[in-house]
Every structure is written in structure tokens, then in C-alpha cells.
Curated annotation (Swiss-Prot):
A cellular component term, taken from the record's GO annotations: cytoplasm
NCBIfam families attached to this UniProt entry: apt (TIGR01090), PRK02304.1-2 (NF002633), PRK02304.1-3 (NF002634), PRK02304.1-5 (NF002636)
Family classification: Belongs to the purine/pyrimidine phosphoribosyltransferase family.
Name of the protein this chain belongs to: Adenine phosphoribosyltransferase
InterPro entries, per database record: Ade_phspho_trans, PRibTrfase_dom, PRTase-like, UPRTase/APRTase
Annotated pathway: Purine metabolism; AMP biosynthesis via salvage pathway; AMP from adenine: step 1/1
């Protein structure tokens, strides 16, 4: 299945010069959504994952069904003020701005093998921040999974020490 047939490209969104890859058509098609999830699950099974972590918000969309299929838990990584218990946080840069991510302090146990799932690999800043949070809690990042990779932004180079799958490249 060619998943690119289920991604809409929106020029100059969210700002001038950016091409936004809209995955909602993929999410709207049950077979495409299932196929994408199954490809990530196949990758994860080779890496003996204990828990799945996904950054807000689209990391939830693919991370949750992957964790369900693997029979492991899911840990949300959120923006400040969105998690109710004690958190750790990390600041990072986006393709078009900056932000902070937070993780509950008790969400990852030392030594747990973690799969980080997100919709998009651009500069790698969001996932790098997520990795820092996971490793600060003693988790071991066993793999990274992305629906889309924006090759020209070279995020893979920042993350090349981790096993990785991307389902589409632009």
C-alpha cells in the first residue's frame, strides 16, 4: 500500500514556506491506518519493547494502537501544564518555533525498553527532547518509529544511534 496516497500536502501552512503533511486522510481510511500501525508493530516486535512513548498530540494517534497491539503500556509526553502529577521537562526547537515537553516522573521504570512513536520526523527536536526525558528516568530507547520523514531537514542525523523506521519520506 502506498501511504503517500493518504497524505495531503498543504503549502504555506502553518506559515509561509512550510509544506504541512496532513495525515488526517490516512486516519480517515481504516485500511491505511491499520496498515501503517501494523508496519510499526512489526518493527517494534524485533526490538522487544516494554512500553511505548508518544509526544503530543499526533504521537498519541499512532502510539496508542501500537502499544495496544504489542500488549504494553503507553506513556504520553505532553506540553507544560497538561500532566497532573510531578513531571520532568525539557525544552526543544521545532521546525518552525520552540517548545517544552513534560513526562510524569513515575512513567518510565529504569531499564524499560522504550519505543518512541510520532507522526513526523523533521529536525528531530521533538523526538530528541522525548529521548532526553525517557533517558533521564532510566529508560532505554530501543527504537523510533515515524509515519513521515522530511529528509531535507536531516532529523535522522540527530538520531542515528537509535534503530528507526519511517513509513514515508518527503
Amino acid at each position: 500500500m502506498d501511504l503517500k496516497n493518504y497524505v495531503a500536502s498543504i503549502e504555506n501552512y502553518p506559515k509561509e514556506g512550510i509544506i504541512f503533511r496532513d495525515i488526517t486522510p490516512l486516519m480517515n481510511d481504516g485500511e491505511a491506518y491499520k496498515y501503517a500501525t501494523e508496519k510499526i508493530v512489526e518493527f517494534a516486535k524485533d526490538h522487544h519493547i516494554d512500553i511505548v512513548v508518544g509526544p503530543e498530540a499526533r504521537g498519541f494517534i499512532f502510539g496508542c494502537p501500537v502499544s495496544y497491539a504489542l500488549g504494553v503500556g503507553f506513556v504520553p509526553v505532553r506540553k507544560p501544564g497538561k500532566l497532573p502529577r510531578e513531571v520532568i521537562e525539557y525544552a526543544y526547537d521545532l521546525e518552525y518555533g520552540s517548545n517544552k515537553l513534560c513526562l510524569h516522573k513515575d512513567s518510565i521504570k529504569p531499564g524499560q525498553k522504550v519505543l518512541v512513536v510520532d507522526d513526523l520526523l523533521a529536525t528531530g527536536g521533538t523526538v530528541e527532547a522525548t529521548i532526553k526525558l525517557v533517558e533521564e528516568l532510566g529508560g532505554v530507547v530501543a527504537g523510533l518509529a515515524f509515519l513521515i520523514e522530511l529528509v531535507d531537514l536531516k532529523g535522522r542525523e540527530r538520531l542515528d544511534k537509535y534503530p528507526m523506521i519511517t513509513l514515508m519520506q518527503y
